[in-house]
């Protein structure tokens, strides 16, 4: 089964009630006796998709509940109480485990801290939002000049 972007789960009403597969990284997890809740993000949107795990029918691997783990979740997309959507998980596959010393946690990190880890910056909401704004601005600038007959030229680098 082909995976569905998390962005599409929020934007396409026709997906509600259907069985789908989503892949992403665990942003937060809450665990109780009978239920577990994960928030999954795949980078296609700033929103996080809540995954509901009924422990009576599905026992998640402990690795799946760790912040930063990469998962594939198969389940049914349903409307949630807060006018959003969530996935009732039927199957969870851990695609990538997260090391014990994973530096990103639930709390907000300073820009100084993130400067020391450029490979993880895009996993934060701040840098994700900055990249999206820059993308929209660059597209608008290119469209403006293209519509006026300008040609975009990649100049050679002089070293």
Put a short name on every predicted segment.
Residues 1-159:
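Class II aminoacyl-tRNA synthetase catalytic cores and aaRS-like
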């Amino acid at each position: 089964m082909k995976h569905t972007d998390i962005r599409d789960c929020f934007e396409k009403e026709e997906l509600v009630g259907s069985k789908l597969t989503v892949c992403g990284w665990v942003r937060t997890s809450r665990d109780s006796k009978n239920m577990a809740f994960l928030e999954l993000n795949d980078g296609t949107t700033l929103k996080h998709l809540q995954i509901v795990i009924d422990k009576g029918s599905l026992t998640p691997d402990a690795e799946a509940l760790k912040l930063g783990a990469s998962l594939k979740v198969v389940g049914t997309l349903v409307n949630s109480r807060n006018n959003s959507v969530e996935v009732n998980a039927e199957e969870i596959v851990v695609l990538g485990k997260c090391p014990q010393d994973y530096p990103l946690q639930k709390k907000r990190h300073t820009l100084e801290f993130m400067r020391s880890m450029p490979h993880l910056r895009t996993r934060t909401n701040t840098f994700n939002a900055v990249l999206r704004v820059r993308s929209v601005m660059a597209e608008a600038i290119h469209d403006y000049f293209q519509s006026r007959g300008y040609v975009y030229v990649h100049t050679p680098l002089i070293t």
